[in-house]
Amino acid sequence: GEEGPVNLDLVADGPHALVAGCTGSGKSEALLGWLAAIAHCYSPEQVRFILIDYKGGATFARLEALPHTQALLTDLDAGATTRALEGIASILQRREESLGALGFPDLAAWESAHEEDPVSVSAPPPRLIVAIDEFRVLAQAHPDSMEVLLRLAAQGRSLGLHLIAATQRPSGAVSAQMRANMDI
């Protein structure tokens, strides 16, 4: 921009983001660039990606080889998407239990404590970015999964989960409750 580089920080500005635009507007390329920049700035020990691509896998295929990419799911295997969302819910439950056992209110506090004293404080788990290209198609194909995604979005800030949803038309696909947690 005219004032210099634009920075989007999911921790400071998020926790979640909505990328919207018509066909050919560059949504997928913007999302790819953003994820590549995150991978460039943070190690796989700091951030992991779960990529859900409802365009058959074409968008995120270039990111699959990154050590940050934990999973790439497509509309070609609908059962895998359901299992992945259930798995993410389990990960968040374990994080919540770990935070409680260690006495930290949220992942950011755990990260700060580890940074100050890496010998005494164990390393926190990586932040988890769930990026969904063609969110509307996912919502239509898996309407039951929207409840799980809503719960994940609500818990995301404190537990280190960040949802990035890309879609042509957010209305009808992204609920008001979910939008309330999407600050970017």
List the predicted regions and their residue ranges:
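P-loop NTPase catalytic phosphate-binding loop
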Residues: G1-E111, S120-I184
